Amino acid sequence: MFRARITLAVLLLSLIPISHSHAADVVYPGDRPFTLVVPTTYQSGTPAPLIIALHGYTADAPYADSYFALGKAADEKGILAVYPSGSRDSNGFLYWNATPACCNFDSSSVDDEAYLLSIIDSVSKDYSVDPARIYIIGHSNGGFMAHHMACKQSERIAAIVSLAGSTYSNTRSCKPSSPVSVLQIHGTKDAVISFTGGYLFGNAYPSARKTIDIWGQINECGKKPARVLPRLDLDRKIPGAETTVLRYKGCKAGTNSELWTIDKGVHSPELSATFADNVINFLLTHPKKSA
């Protein structure tokens, strides 16, 4: 078990950060501090969108910041961006307590759902946050946590983006009371969280396609998703527009369930310059509406 976890950690730590600068960083102190990036265009009294960016297993908040590289696009769109860190497990690795599959390997009782809600409440107290535009993006374990929040806190979360994560295998564990737009992004060559689904230490997680099918049913979408053009260029290491878009239509309350498949993409793709714009555009076009 320990050796398997170390192997997983080594795979996840192979990511290469991308550095960039911010407009203004505000650090919230406490037992679990987090960083809020305030856009240069922010005006008190004008409700702004809020995005929470979640790192993967073994990574941390600064890594999520540099890897997703949302800074420029978020600033241009007037988005408040939050970068929190998970808890440390017995091996010293940071993780989120999301679904049974990933990545609370110590069976800890840590409540990350409550922690993320407290972040939303704290930022909303100090800044003008639009309650209809609260979003989460996560990579790997962070993607699992994004799905968890969509399942358990659907009244607060408008939409999520999961890169190389997955939702609950047991659909009885995901019974949201409100529709949530879901974008699943996954590489076909992911060797950590398989595109076709699988198990982590005996706990199942659904495939990328099954994940959006589950949300298609939850959001009462049309029977079958359809491919949408144009293809996208999300991975700068793969030539051309390598990513196909599969989209459910006719979903409840203007929501969506989409799969962006990175052909030959790995667990931690080298994200292109257009990645941030594409995912932020998805989020902003899916605010929370009355069901």
Where are these regions (language model features)?
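Primarily recognizes the serine-hydrolase "nucleophile elbow" in alpha/beta-hydrolase
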Residues: 124-128, 132-180, 191
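The conserved beta1-alpha1 loop
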Residues: 52-58, 164, 186-187, 263
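C-terminal catalytic histidine-bearing segment of alpha/beta-hydrolase fold enzymes
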Residues: 181-185, 206, 218-291
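Conserved alpha/beta-hydrolase "acid-adjacent" motif
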Residues: 191-196, 203-207, 270-272
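Acidic beta-to-alpha connecting loop that harbors the catalytic carboxylate
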Residues: 86, 188-191, 198, 263-266
